[in-house]
Amino acid sequence: MACYIVPYYHHPVLSHPNREIFSHRHHHHHRFCNNLLNRRISVPRSSAISDGGVSYNTLVSEAVRLLVPQANFDSSKLKVEFLGELLENKSNGGIITPRTYILSHCDFTANLTLTISNVINLDQLEGWYKKDDVVAEWKKVNDELRLHIHCCVSGMSLLQDVAAELRYHIFSKELPLVLKAVVHGDSVMFRENPELMDAYVWVYFHSSTPKYNRIECWGPLKDAAKGKQQGNHQGFLSSTTSRKLIRHKSIFHTLFTFLL
């Protein structure tokens, strides 16, 4: 598993946003909104990463392995909802970008809900960090499609900060189930575009703790969904490097910055 650690960044334009720009009902806001969403953050290249490593509490990792049961994907417990343009044409698997996913779960029933859309609204994103939802989006980088996964490890509450390492390991353990839910729930698109199973999965762990505020490459989707991970490569990004990376932002990064 290739691993890259990045700090949070703040864009001056997005520091004090007007939340109304996400309402497509107002034409004069629509153009400004599109300009923001077209800004994308580049994935760091290995040449931009200095050598380094991350040390973890092996007791926490082992506790998660032993005490947190491995969740097996059960398609009968998955509910799929299509929103936006995809609501009118669910069978159209050709719309790959923009295409986003939000996977939510119920702790009591173990039921899953996968929302598939071409946009992410603020109400959905608030649920991302309040209910431990997982957000994903397809993104084209250098003519290659990649699936970007976003998990909120800590930063939204004191309890999350205290349990940052525990939450990181739990998210890591549950990610194969998340990927299986995406593949099953959006089966029409994957059936029409089988090459997407070879697309690389990039996982963004968002945290106020620098150690867990990181990006990890989990390899091809077909392997990541099975929990198979490749060789480990780690490194730290310097603050200078991170500033250079603030060139383009994904839909998710733009919306997330609006909540900060």
Curated annotation (Swiss-Prot):
Catalytic activity: chlorophyllide a + 2 H(+) = pheophorbide a + Mg(2+)
Induction note: Down-regulated during natural and dark-induced leaf senescence.
EC top class, as a word: lyase
Keyword Lipoprotein carried by entry: no
Localization of this protein: Plastid, Chloroplast thylakoid
GO molecular function per UniProt: lyase activity
Pfam families noted in UniProt: Staygreen (PF12638)
One BP term from GO: chlorophyll catabolic process
Assembly description: Interacts with the light harvesting complex II (LHCII). Interacts with the chlorophyll catabolic enzymes (CCEs) NYC1, NOL, PAO and RCCR.
Database matches in PANTHER family: MAGNESIUM DECHELATASE SGRL, CHLOROPLASTIC (PTHR31750:SF18), PROTEIN STAY-GREEN 1, CHLOROPLASTIC-RELATED (PTHR31750)
Family listed: Belongs to the staygreen family.
Protein known as: Magnesium dechelatase SGRL, chloroplastic
Organism encoding this protein: Arabidopsis thaliana (Mouse-ear cress)
